[in-house]
Amino acid sequence: GISLSTNQINYCKEKAKKLGLENQVKFELIDYRLVKGNYDRIVSVGFGEHLGVKFYNTFFKKINSILNENGNFLFHLIGVVDKPSAPNQFINKYIFPGGVCPSLSQLIKPIEKTGLIVADTETLIRHYDKTLEAWLERFLAKRNEIKDLFDEKFCKMWEFYLASCAAAFRYRDLVVFQLQ
């Protein structure tokens, strides 16, 4: 796996070691544009929202250049089912600056432009609201401990973020896309 987050890389390495998998997996702190080699399988989960639409051409071109001829690429991200629109102002300001939840039309064109073939598209419209509700429950159960690490303002923002996203998924304003 690759990431620009030292915390993510360290967490993954520790988890792999606990599971006895440290010799079977590799985690690297690197920008995706610098990845070398050829791969049979590439999976991207939760990165497309942070990448931003303006960098999709670069990203998919890179994927195409390192994916073997008969390889498989899975792109999993949160999106919108409506027409392309501006990012949510609250989330863009306080949670994920520069982030965007794209429409399917914003994804397909740059994928096809790079020569990748969209073989399967799935829109997951059930259950993610329940995931966010579970995260909110866990957050609320540990709220005092989290407040000690951050502050009350952060706790209120995070609580609002999780609750509003759960509602957005429940009412189909947000969905999860999986493209292969």
Task: Spell out what each predicted region is.
Residues 1-34:
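Class I SAM-dependent methyltransferase SAM/SAH-binding core
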Residues 21, 51-52, 67-69:
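Helix-to-beta-strand junctions that scaffold the AdoMet/dcAdoMet cofactor pocket
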Residues 30-43, 173:
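A short acidic, Gly/Pro-enriched loop at the edge of an enzyme's catalytic core
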Residues 34, 50-51:
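A short His-aromatic
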Residues 44-49:
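Residues lining the SAM
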Residues 56-59, 75-77, 83-84:
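Serine-hydrolase catalytic core recognition
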Residues 57-72:
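A short glycine-rich, Lys/Arg-flanked "PGG" loop and its adjoining helix->strand segment in the class I
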Residues 78-178:
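Substrate-binding/catalytic lobe of Class I Rossmann-like enzymes that use SAM or dcSAM, i.e.
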